Amino acid sequence: MFNHETAGYPDFTEWPNARKSSTHQTQYYRWLERAWMGGLRLVVQHATTNSIICDMVVGNAVQATRYSCNDMVAVDRIIDETYAMERYIDAQNGGPGTGFFRVVTTPEQAREVIGAGQMAVILGIEDRRGGI
């Protein structure tokens, strides 16, 4: 399921490691769950990308290209993975709609999800041009 280690303190087996993953933000669902259990109810999940940096690190052989450096291809992939994480969290909690993590698309949905005690996740996009 995961392409990197998720253990943090005290081992730090995989992160932080800027040389290996300078363009990759990690977000393990258990870390979000811990924040939700502590009372966090609203999160903005930015699909953040920068094709210039991606092209530079690939061109200088700092990192191999795993996916396209095209901004919108990367944004679509990040959004798809956010929905996949929602489905995964639901599956861990009994099925569709049962997890703490809910992607919302309207203020009304956010209020409903927060009122139900779940975490409302707003999708955003930020690219090298400063946003879309």
Predicted segments with their positions:
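N-terminal hydrophobic targeting/anchoring segments and the immediately downstream early-domain regions
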Residues: 1-132
